[in-house]
Amino acid sequence: IGIAEALGAAGKGVIQIISDLVDFDQEFALAKAMGERSGRPVSMSVAQAKGRPEQWRRTLDAMSQATAEGIVMRGQVGARAVGLLMGHQGTLNPFMHCEAYKAIAHLPLAERVEALRRDEVRAAILDNIIVDKESPIIGSRLVTKWHIMYPLGDPPDYEPDASTSLAAIAERTGADPAVLAYDLLLERNGTAMIYVPTVNFADGNLDSVREQLLHDAAVPGLSDGGAHVGTICDVSFPTTLMQWWGRDR
């Protein structure tokens, strides 16, 4: 509250809050009080979380009510799901914890791809896939969650159907999903990627995103193209907003 009051004394600026709102009533009340005491608008990041798939609606509705009371609150919402990118050019891939992969991970991409195409390297990696549950790397525990992993494609498909997940393809074809991932990531000379939608994809589609964008308390935002660029790159959210929502979907 003290920080908010100082911003109010300055007479300009926006209070930006990022919170999971685990204790919704208490945390939202604090955010609202910051806006009320400062007289400044409040912006909060809002998205559909898998564990609480309807809370985004409650949050935006509460913001609308606060604004009607004279406390301006807006929810920043994304233009699509926030997703992890896996590939040989990024931080994550399904084989990153394998000793055989670690042995070649330092190589330039072209040399690494050449090594990955050797039968002995392929066998050494695919026979020893592990997940390091102690790894501090964001997203590293998801590298073999085949049911939520999709070929990103070119052009990218940011609303993939469940039938196109690596797990679903493996079930239909009788293939090993790890083998599918291995071959996929070698496409386009090792630049192909796997997409793992997390936030805003609890229903397996982007219907909730559409509702968020149309809500009177929402403003489009949340494009992350810097701090996590090796894992998450959502800098194209504005393009998605204009091209995909405005024209294609």
Model-derived regions, located:
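Active-site neighborhoods of metal-dependent hydrolases
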Residues: 1-8, 13-249
